[in-house]
From Swiss-Prot:
An individual GO BP term: symbiont-mediated suppression of host innate immune response
Any Gene Ontology CC annotation: host cell mitochondrion
RNA-binding: region residues: 1-73
Transmembrane feature ranges: none
Domain notes: The dsRNA-binding region is required for suppression of RNA silencing. The N-terminus is involved in homodimerization. The alpha2 helices of the dimer bind parallel to the stem of the dsRNA helix.
Subcellular location: Host mitochondrion
Region (Disordered): 85-106
The protein, known as: Protein B2
UniProt subunit comment: Homodimer. Interacts with RNA-directed RNA polymerase.
Stored InterPro entries: RNA-bd_B2, RNA-bd_B2_sf
SUPFAM superfamilies documented for this protein: FHV B2 protein-like
Keywords: Host mitochondrion, Host-virus interaction, Inhibition of host innate immune response by virus, RNA-binding, Suppressor of RNA silencing, Viral immunoevasion
Source organism (scientific name): Boolarra virus
């Protein structure tokens, strides 16, 4: 059984082969409305091929995705910039002072 990583890596090639099969189809003798639909199918397949290529490249560039697909432990997530700034602000704030008298109990 192929690994998840190998399956993902093969996607662009598999789609390329499917697109080539459709592009090789001869349909010049088909009626105009059929030819137009098949032209649209070819355009769709070409766009799908480009989209899959970009997505696979993007996914495999992410260390956590590559580690998951290879079955390795995931790298620790780094805190976002907002989380780091919030921690920094909290560490620099002076402790609250009680200048107001405590509310009276009824």
């Amino acid at each position: 059984m192929q690994s998840k990583l190998a399956l993902i890596q093969e996607l662009p090639d598999r789609i390329q082969k499917a697109v080539e099969v459709v592009l090789a189809m001869s349909y010049q003798e088909a009626p105009n409305n059929v030819r137009r639909d098949l032209d649209n199918l070819q355009a769709c397949l070409n766009k799908a091929k480009q989209t899959v290529n970009r997505m696979v490249t993007s996914l495999l560039d992410k260390p956590s995705m590559a580690a998951y697909l290879e079955g390795k432990p995931l790298p620790e997530e780094r805190p976002t910039l907002e989380e780091r700034l919030r921690k920094l602000e909290l560490s620099r704030e002076p402790p609250p002072t009680r200048s107001d008298p405590a509310p009276a109990k009824l």
